[in-house]
Amino acid sequence: MIVSAQPRPTGHPGYSETLPCLEESAEVARKLVRTALAAWHLHELADTGTLLVSELVANAVKHTNSRLIRVVISRPSERNVRIGVVDKSRTMPEITKSNGEELLLGGRGLVLMDAVTERWGTDLYRWGKQVWGELRCEEAV
């Protein structure tokens, strides 16, 4: 696996890694998120960031037929951290209304993401999509 760190217009490097589309990749994705947040001195976002990337990886594994996914962590602004997962599916994620029992059995990934992020969205590409969530930094670094 190759991890890349690319400079961005905000002056903070972005981090990304291509991983197999498997449940086991969530552990590597969490380590990448912790590494990026530590580099930016944003340790307070580590728990939420790792929870977010775990849900994004789980959704890609469950809802796509992709062989590979790409985990992307960036700073679109001084105040935000964006964590995303890119896959080859063009199916857009939706928050579905369901009863509490259904949520206990699964299907809470997007509900959880909606609760812990400042905002989230999907960037659709010709060949797939990126689902991402943004976390708000308490203080600009």
Which residues make up each language-model segment?
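Short coil/turn residues that cap or connect secondary-structure elements
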Residues: 21, 37, 41-44, 61, ...
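Conserved beta-strand-loop-beta-strand hairpin that lines the nucleotide-binding pocket
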Residues: 1-16, 61-141
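Conserved short strand/loop->alpha-helix "switch" segment adjacent to the catalytic nucleotide/phosphoryl-transfer site
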Residues: 27-54
